[in-house]
Amino acid sequence: MGSLNVSIVTPDGPVYEGVAQMVIARTKAGELGILPGHVPLVAPLKIDIVRLKVESGEEWVAVNGGFMEVNGEEVNILADTAEREQDIDIDRAEKAKQRAEEELSRAKEQKVDEVMAQLALQRAINRIHAKEHN
């Protein structure tokens, strides 16, 4: 089986550069599995985990929105933010989740920006999920 050159980049710089046999990502249209030779595409990403099937097993990256471009044997992900599972501070992620839940509760009571609170909660849960998947 061939391989894919994968790049995950945020405005702050590269998060992942490497080779994978498969990339699995959740787009706005649903989950996609990308193998070498996949048709070219550009797809908006949801807040979710990008799973990279590599020789040593699987790597998870918490991606918070952005776009995925597939072109030949290359997969480029331009993410709003992204963190590899080994870089996630679980205590910080748990605190962010708690703050987001509290903000969401206040938002419902005070009719303030509920959408922003829901997004913050999704991002925190996504980071926790990436860190605790094993």
From Swiss-Prot:
Keyword Phosphoprotein: no
A GO term, aspect molecular function: ATP binding
Subcellular location: Cell membrane
UniProt keyword terms in alphabetical order: ATP synthesis, Cell membrane, CF(1), Hydrogen ion transport, Ion transport, Membrane, Transport
GO biological process: proton motive force-driven ATP synthesis
Listed SUPFAM superfamilies: Epsilon subunit of F1F0-ATP synthase C-terminal domain, Epsilon subunit of F1F0-ATP synthase N-terminal domain
A cellular-component GO term for this protein: proton-transporting ATP synthase complex
A Pfam match: ATP-synt_DE
Protein's membrane topology: Peripheral membrane protein
InterPro entries: ATP_F1_dsu/esu_C_sf (IPR036794), ATP_synth_F1_dsu/esu (IPR001469), ATP_synth_F1_dsu/esu_N (IPR020546), ATP_synth_F1_esu_C (IPR020547), ATPsynth_dsu/esu_N (IPR036771)
Tagged with keyword Ion transport: yes
Principal place of residence: membrane
Family that this chain belongs to: Belongs to the ATPase epsilon chain family.
PANTHER family given in the database record: ATP SYNTHASE DELTA/EPSILON CHAIN, ATP SYNTHASE EPSILON CHAIN, CHLOROPLASTIC
HAMAP family documented for this protein: ATP_synth_epsil_bac
Reported function: Produces ATP from ADP in the presence of a proton gradient across the membrane.
Summary of subunit composition and partner proteins: F-type ATPases have 2 components, CF(1) - the catalytic core - and CF(0) - the membrane proton channel. CF(1) has five subunits: alpha(3), beta(3), gamma(1), delta(1), epsilon(1). CF(0) has three main subunits: a, b and c.
Protein name stated in the entry: ATP synthase epsilon chain
Taxonomic path: Bacteria, Bacillati, Bacillota, Bacilli, Bacillales
Gene: atpC
